[in-house]
Amino acid sequence: MRINPTTSGPGVSTLEKKNLGRIAQIIGPVLDVAFPPGKMPNIYNALVVKGRDTVGQQINVACEVQQLLGNNRVRAVAMSATDGLMRGMEVIDTGAPLSVPVGGATLGRIFNVLGEPVDNLGPVDTRTTSPIHRSAPAFIQLDTKLSIFETGIKVVDLLAPYRRGGKIGLFGGAGVGKTVLIMELINNIAKAHGGVSVFGGVGERTREGNDLYMEMKESGVINEQNIAESKVALVHGQMNEPPGARMRVGLTALTMAEYFRDVNEQDVLLFIDNIFRFVQAGSEVSALLGRMPSAVGYQPTLSTEMGSLQERITSTKEGSITSIQAVYVPADDLTDPAPATTFAHLDATTVLSRGLAAKGIYPAVDPLDSTSTMLQPRIVGEEHYETAQRVKQTSQRYKELQDIIAILGLDELSEEDRLTVARARKMERFLSQPFFVAEVFTGSPGKYVGLAETIRGFQLILSGELDGLPEQAFYLVGNIDEATAKAMKLELESNLKK
């Protein structure tokens, strides 16, 4: 599907038409605007309020039309703070949806929801813009090839492999490591992946956005000397922004990614942290617009809003968008409408467990809850599939035995079950891995483990060849050879202590 990019955003030639309205009412980030009869703007049109507040400060607020109220009034949601706005102020209808800069000039830059650079590096060197509201590609344009996307993270590649050009969700409650995992994936994939990446920070901490930017500059993903050679564009609408900005910033990032896919015909990585905040912002806006809340207080249009974003994230015959999305799980409840609605759109789900995080096993990926449509013998091969299934079966058996162990103790188990528990505990620890982005916290250098090495390691544990090694030797190591070397080191240390 080809985009027809325009060469002017709202605020250039479109403002010359001067379809003017006036503010009739302001309720927080929501404005009611009265227009002359027959001059009503369309839904999703961008409106601009320009003027001065009571102390003479310049005001420039962009809004998006959400409802037509009748009596020549529209209700719009502001994309920035509405401080200083007053009733009777002039509002300009731009006659088009919000448009943002697209193309190679966006790489290495940080944008807000309106596509304005916020990195103090001057204006963006492009006049090509694209509207943030577009329809999804038609069925006939979609690409259905199946291939695996290697991440270098053992637990992901073995148990819930990612699809190239697919949608992946990282589910987890507060503080279990979603953002660190996303940053590691950016580190591993964006470096190895020749194409471009777009990162959408939706309603997350400003500090994390800043850390990510600094890290990308250090690793060379953003080239400070020659910005044009950078590999990533960053779009941020953080926690302190009004709900309108948080609701639309995901679409801004997606629009930039779509241009690389459709016009430049590239394979693109789209990272979104956090898709729950997109839903949360939609819920806030829905309440402000006076809609009746639905299940658990969410907006009645939850599925539609999610679908309109997710259906545009897809692979076409021109290029692909592989999307990795962090999904906050409120109160660790996966049945909450926000994560539950997201599940339906994903090819792979990586579920992070608080129990594993509490044990200090990072990444805290739950081997039993995480799923992938790619884990089929015809796609990954018999050897990979068999190993993954045996790892899951052993983990499941260990989980079933935990109650018995808690009540009666390990000694009451049969010899076979004791062996299963010992191997499951080794595997649980072997699924942990030192991350490149966490080197400063852990003190251990990060490890990238290829898929073949991962499969070999788990086969050795399952076969019983490593039954004699202590389980702590498998904790936070890369491949299986490092685990055996660590076991020898531990044995040497214990002998010296004696």
UniProtKB/Swiss-Prot annotation:
PROSITE patterns: ATPASE_ALPHA_BETA. Pfam families: ATP-synt_ab (PF00006), ATP-synt_ab_N (PF02874), ATP-synt_VA_C (PF22919). GO terms for biological process: proton motive force-driven mitochondrial ATP synthesis. The keyword Membrane applies. It catalyses: ATP + H2O + 4 H(+)(in) = ADP + phosphate + 5 H(+)(out). CDD domains: ATP-synt_F1_beta_C, ATP-synt_F1_beta_N, F1-ATPase_beta_CD. Disulfide bonds: none annotated. This is ATP synthase subunit beta, chloroplastic. It comes from Idiospermum australiense. The lineage of its organism: Eukaryota, Viridiplantae, Streptophyta, Embryophyta, Tracheophyta.
